[in-house]
UniProtKB/Swiss-Prot annotation:
Gene Ontology, cellular component aspect: plasma membrane
Recorded topology in the membrane: Multi-pass membrane protein
Name assigned to this protein: Large-conductance mechanosensitive channel
Membrane-traversing stretches: 35-55, 97-117
PROSITE patterns (UniProt xref): MSCL
GO molecular function: mechanosensitive monoatomic ion channel activity
Record has Cell membrane as a keyword: yes
Annotated compartments: Cell inner membrane
Protein's gene: mscL
Function statement: Channel that opens in response to stretch forces in the membrane lipid bilayer. May participate in the regulation of osmotic pressure changes within the cell.
Keywords: Cell inner membrane, Cell membrane, Ion channel, Ion transport, Membrane, Transmembrane, Transmembrane helix, Transport
Length: 159
């Protein structure tokens, strides 16, 4: 095999591999999954903003100005800072306020997704319920069905 044949061989293999990849990537499930991941990432940003910019300030106002993201417990005596960022620089801290915020984010995402999926399931169920039943067969169709069934049983007219 000379070098020209080798190049052609690799071009054919590469072309086949590229075609297989394109076919795989263009399947509905893969494209749907990619769209879902992108929308999910954007939705995560919305929920993070909802928690950080709307819900937590309301909770903070109700609790007298508490900022949960800066709540921590020092695990080292050398930690004397008042903010989480500074405390982390000084030593080991248990950042339970940040954990509380992240947990709240998760619970809100889970609740919203549950509500969306529940609504979609209800819409799907309503669509199935509103489907019209199949039309009743005409008299001619009933007779033809009876004849077909009799022929299947072998009970046709005898000669």
């Amino acid at each position: 095999m000379n070098s020209t044949d080798s190049v052609r061989h690799f071009e054919q293999k590469g072309s086949k591999l590229l075609k297989e990849f394109r076919d795989f990537a263009m399947k509905g499930n893969v494209v749907d999954l990619a769209v879902g991941v992108i929308i999910g990432a954007a939705f995560g940003g919305i929920v993070t903003s909802l928690v950080g910019d709307v819900i937590m300030p309301i909770i903070s106002a109700i609790t007298g100005g508490l900022d949960f993201s800066n709540y921590f417990t020092a695990l080292s005596k050398s930690v004397t800072a008042n903010t989480l960022a500074e405390a982390k620089k000084q030593g080991a801290v248990l950042a339970w306020g940040n954990f509380l915020t992240v947990t709240l984010n998760f619970l809100i995402i889970a609740a919203v997704l549950f509500a969306v999926i529940r609504s979609l399931n209800k819409l799907k169920q309503q669509a199935e319920e509103t489907k019209s039943p199949p039309p009743t067969p005409t008299r001619q169709e009933e007779l033809l069905t009876e004849i077909r069934d009799l022929l299947k049983k072998g009970a046709g007219p005898s000669p």
